[in-house]
Structures are given as C-alpha cells and as structure tokens.
C-alpha cells in the first residue's frame, strides 16, 4: 500500500471521514466499496478493517479526531525509508536532548541504539551525550540514498568533544552492513553572538558513502560576528558575519 503514497493518503482520508461522520455507537461501516475503488489487495484488508474499527471506537469515546494524521505520520517515514524512495538531500535541525533529561525508557533505547552504531561514549560521559548525533546518523541511515548529501544543525560539541567521537568517525555499525558517511568540513558557529539556541551550534556536512567512511575533518570553517537579533534575516546577518 505504501508504494503509492497518493492512494494510501486517500485510503486514510476515507477511513477518517467515515469514522467521524457515522452516528456515535452505530455499526462500523463496511469498507468494501473503498477497497474496490482503490484496488486494495485482499491480504491487506483485515488489518485495515481492524484499524478502522479502532478509529470508530476512538471517535465514539469523544477522543481527538487526529487519527488520520496519526496514521499518516506513522506510515510516511516507513514509505520514505524504502530504498527506492530515499532522498538526494537531507537538511534540518535534529532535536537536541541531553541524556540526563531523557526518561528512563528513552535512556535505555538511546543507549541500545547508540551502542549498535558505535555512538555510545561510555558511562562516564553518559550525562553529556545528546540525542542529536543518534538522530542525525539514523536519519541518514533510513532516508538518505547512497551518494546523497546532508547539512544538519547540531550542538557545537558535535565537532570536537569526546562524547561525539563515534559520530565523527563516519561509520555507524558494522563496516559491511552499517551506514557510512563521508564528512566534509563543518561550520563552527560558537563565536557568533547572540547564540541561535541555548547552546552554541555547528553545521555538519557530508554525504552517504556506504563502505567508504570519511571521518569529520578537524579543521572547521569558523564564523564570527554579532547579530542584530537571534533570528535576523540573512540580508542583515550577511553584513556582520
């Protein structure tokens, strides 16, 4: 079903609209006409019907009518992670969340996933570790095609601190089946005032290069200057940086 994103979206819209338009407590409507119109294979119908029954129940309970968006937000990353759908360029600002501020369950998952990719820096540096590096590595692993490029805003510690050493190596997981990154020189933004974020930032660049990792260069392009405001437009910032 995820092979055709437009058809999948139409299916979810139909389910959400039918769940919301039926009378509370009424029988769950049939989806047969939707299945026929969208040519949904027989082997997928039981799972979809089960999901639809859940959507109807949630509507009857007066809970938020967000479930169509919820289903799409779960499914679209799965679609994007398929090799044929991976992107040429990733640009973004991964979430910055220190290990010490994670819940116990999040800490366990973070450590497990970090250890599997060679990103775990050890218990003595655990409280300094940050979700941003794992998020960046995982995003490249799932969504960036081999040869595709990225530019990501990370805490400045990503370019020169010990707890990011595994991230800067460019190899995440086994050399034969893991993800490899070829880094280019990062931007060091710590000397810009005021900071854009509560902590100093950097921008890291590179490309996916499976089997041919290149560690992040130690030399960085250093930006300095004082901005008129943290969110200044580039036309203003360009004159003072």
List where the protein language model places each region.
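Coupling/switch/interface segments within P-loop NTPase motor domains and analogous charged loops
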Residues: 1-86
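Signature of N6-adenine DNA methyltransferases within the class I
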Residues: 69, 76-241
């Amino acid at each position: 079903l995820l092979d055709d994103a437009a058809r999948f979206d139409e299916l979810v819209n139909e389910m959400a609209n039918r769940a919301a338009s039926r009378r509370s407590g009424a029988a769950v409507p049939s989806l047969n006409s939707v299945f026929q119109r969208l040519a949904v294979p027989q082997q997928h119908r039981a799972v979809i019907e089960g999901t639809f029954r859940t959507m109807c129940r949630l509507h009857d309970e007066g809970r938020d009518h967000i479930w169509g968006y919820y289903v799409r937000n779960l499914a679209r990353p799965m679609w994007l992670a398929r090799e044929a759908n991976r992107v040429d360029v990733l640009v973004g600002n991964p979430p910055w969340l220190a290990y010490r501020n994670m819940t116990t369950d999040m800490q366990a998952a973070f450590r497990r996933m970090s250890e599997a990719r060679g990103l775990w820096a050890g218990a003595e540096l655990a409280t300094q570790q940050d979700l941003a590096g794992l998020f960046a590595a995982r995003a490249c692993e799932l969504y960036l095609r081999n040869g595709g490029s990225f530019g990501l805003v990370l805490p400045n510690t990503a370019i020169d601190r010990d707890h990011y050493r595994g991230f800067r190596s460019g190899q995440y997981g086994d050399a034969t089946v893991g993800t490899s990154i070829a880094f280019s020189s990062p931007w060091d933004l710590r000397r810009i005032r005021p900071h854009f974020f509560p902590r100093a930032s950097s921008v890291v660049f590179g490309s996916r290069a499976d089997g041919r990792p290149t560690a992040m260069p130690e030399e960085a392009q250093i930006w300095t200057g004082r901005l008129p405001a943290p969110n200044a437009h580039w036309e203003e910032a360009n004159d003072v940086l």
